[in-house]
């Protein structure tokens, strides 16, 4: 018989037979149909898709030699294909089949399609053709086999077909190289910034070669954000947000459960489908492994001769193909999964941000200033974790089905035990998934509450420190942290239970399966063989992996869906509906011309009325806190505590806050002054004019369109430079005018505005002028500077309507008068521009300048309207004790300035001292320190720090971690050793079938139970004990660091960065780190055990250990240099996004007034895109290391099969089974190790940040010690004891300042040689213009700014030697801004005596009586008593600004027996006359024997003080009795007093 006859080449095969071509070849028919016709048909069918898609695309590359080479090679391909068609058609000399000619014809047709597709994709696509690259790669691989076959045919030497076919193969190799060549250097200029994955070919993307530049850059240098690749267009948030927003808008029922999740899946179905194909390939390659193990064991049992050696060579090729396929498919599957997750982040966060801009700010049920922060941080991270697990559900079910089928083939009915266990685990997991998701949502909610309270405290840290409330406020936060961990325990219990369920199957499943099989075999006459044992064991390993993944995936998916629902609830929250209507019946917001110019508005407006309002508004009733009877609302308006108090007839929560009847008209081009007592609803009325009161019951008719300028009572200042704040979003204005002319005009206007708002002097002092950042919430600015910046922004915007909410109250008298005159005087720029101004105030001094007066009474009703001359009765009001007639008789400001021109112009200039270079030098020094710290941090960022691991272990406790590690090692041993036990059992069965079953099964059972018990102990130690300990440890460390940090830290560090530590960093430590640590320790333990078994099975493999360790070390070293940096960049660049969100929400009323919603959203999206770059690239490099490690495993598997092929007689099938089954398990273990390790690295980044933060941020006391050492004194601070400071310090209140000089590190010296003595019981007022150093002197007494020289003593105790927090706890200070704790009235009134028992509801009755008495004295008790009394839970939204100030004063009053020094920082600046008088009376009587220092702007109230200190430019220029100073003709205090009281002349103090 001839070889051709023995080959059966015309049959499908695929094997050609043992006697055909050495027994190692395919049949010709198989090769021509499967290896030729099938790929050709697929390409011909698929090719039209990219051709149609690219048809309308513009050209993207310029002409090049590459294009010509492709065309030449395509023509050669057509020629050779045509030649092969002719040769096969006329062939009579070589063996052929019925598919030979069709195969050649299809190849020729394909060559024609190839030319068209290659040309189009080269010109119109950024990347190489995926279709052609895949085809050419497969074609080359397949045609190598076909070429071998053709040359091995007996009659091949007489035919031209083999050489022509070989030439075609060689040509396709060249074509593959040409088609795979990337075109970045050929791209047109506008595509130069295309992302690497946008221009990468399939092979580049498949092996992640496109990341190599990033890796080398990160290895060589410290990565900066500019070094990272640009985002792929598909990942840019602008397009993603629009796509998702459009889809969400079309959803009919937005309240349906989980409809947001369903909508997102539908909208981004393509992105979610992309991982499906690589996942299917991964399943195929994975489940090829049991067949390879079976073939290898069978090969090991054969002699080392031909043809068995050929089988071994084929097996080597199969192992290369399968394990390489696993590496590529796993990498591509995970990469595409995380691309989808990145798209989710880019599409959902803008939705949350945009919704936050339109929420109803007057409803707490729908709005909280920082609630959205948790949604875009914790919830988004939770969604990401769950989203990447979605494909694990269906794919693992497929894997489980395949494993069960394969297991049944090996063990028959005995597989029921594994199947049964799988069903039990799946049912249990599904049963646990919902409560797990629910408890995770509860944990996130508890975390949100804590983060909100933390953000609030950090935003007011200055006022907390001044008040000595730092410990109290942060102890509330620490209590919330403990509650959060208690809430999280339920979730952690369920997570641990799910884990135990998942490990029971791989441990107990095989035990019961083999036990049942052994029982059946004993009665059926069969037995366990080595091949059957290890094939079944490998299948069970494969069965366990998807089971474990499902158990892990379902809770994560459930948590992801719960977080989607939380975001959905936010998106469904009640929106603000503008109740205003224009004269055409539409809302002012309907006009898109938010940048309409002033002249345009005036030209289109009609009549003399700008806006009209009539109706009522009541704060809507929300669900009150139990027993409080009080409504939670949001807004900075006054009066809604006072005005919603139940009256005698019952609950009046729906009583109107404002009642405007009859109609109130705001005249156009005039100044309308709204007057009224504290808490009367002035701010609420302004909110109504802005359209902020959605539930306003009445009519608001706006006879204008477009934006309004608005200054809130509490200025909204984002953390930007002074210049950017003043210019606002005006840079985005569009105009037909020449841009350079417009820029010049804007610059001229900018200078005018700066001058009008008296900011030029401040800019000269600030180290960077108008480029100086203001800090979070303007923390680095004084109160007056913040107000003037807010006013300047409003003026700069040049809108027709200007609404000002008590904006002059924070300014000193001189500055207030000058700014008011510059803006609203007879020649003021707002007057000249004929702007309509509405000013709310409690100060009647501005009455003479108003065109219209609106007088509100205490119940929010319009008591009177008219001109200043009509309001004689205002003098009869209890809240305005000034004589209005006298006010109206005062000269205008022009006259005042003229008469006192010597002071307003010359006197201040004489007093101004040129600032030294101290500030600049200090600033440079700070920069050097910061650069040094940054350099140190950068080194750690790149190289890593093993101390971080020790730091985390320390937080949990060494004993806890030791028990955990030992337990996991025991678990690994008990779970790995059964493979050896099974080998011994199978070998024993070959000698004595089915004997000693009790021994074999008994030991197996002991190992299984031991594994479960050890895992249970380890899980408990980690998930319960470790999280509780480390969670409290790291939070307390952050609290301690932040609360003790100096003010300089808070003024220069963005609040969002610090909040990020309390939110994302702690979330990573709580949620990610323990699971990742468990995965890493488990995987390492199992990996070591499995590799030991592999080495025991094949001693030659042990020789690879040094090589393996070296390769793995090199990979991780190369990877970590970049990954660590990306991890930290990811965390760092998420902080600005959180800051932007917090700033936007806190200033949403201002943003909506100015119509800056679009600009704010665009800015947020830019920040989001920046944060996406390190986040996405971190995901990518993690996929790279997964791919790299899988390739290492491929090499190990190939080496092992090579050893099996060449040394199989020495190894034996038993050890081959152990080695290969453990290589299979080792592969899964290494994948798990990498997955857990990269997560652990991210989480440990949070630990490293906290560690670095706690080490680098020095405490106030540390800086105090440095100051003492610098002065040559003992650097130890005094420990406050009766022996060191006295029994009750300060007991007298004598204050002495001796040559005190102080400075801020960032802005230079602020106090110069201040010397003054204040005797016990004296009352001293500190006055001066804004920025003169009043607040700096105040802060120096509290140890909040650095003292360069001199000393401050109180009762002979040097303040520099005292711990800073102790100092502030002993001095009673009332700050300029009040801080209201979220808690009961009792806690707020008397927080200092609740430190040890926060939350206690049963304090002594006597103390309650004292609290009530004090609240009565300040006028708050009547409003509180009917709402729950001292047990009423309040927050900062329940009190108007004035009422909150009274609450702070009540705190001070309750400390009457604890100190003798009272500091008042402009405590009455925002109060009406009656309330100011009340506070003055309390200070003079309640604190009669105290030493009082008061910063004052209202100078008529301090004439009875003992002394007045006048500061200017940080120098003490006058210090004497106020009435004595008023007698001096050249007294600066006299000039300030005249301006403060609007008096043109002053004959004697007694006349006032």
From Swiss-Prot:
Induction: Expression is positively regulated by the leucinostatins biosynthesis cluster-specific transcription regulator lcsF. The chain crosses the membrane at residues 32-52, 68-88, 100-120, 158-178, 280-300, 311-331, 413-433, 457-477, 500-520, 528-548, 957-977, 1005-1025, 1076-1096, 1100-1120, 1184-1204, 1210-1230. Residues 639-884, 1295-1538 form the ABC transporter domain. It comes from the Eukaryota. GO terms for cellular component: plasma membrane. Belongs to the ABC transporter superfamily. ABCC family. Conjugate transporter (TC 3.A.1.208) subfamily. This is ABC multidrug transporter lscH. It comes from Purpureocillium lilacinum. The gene is lcsH.
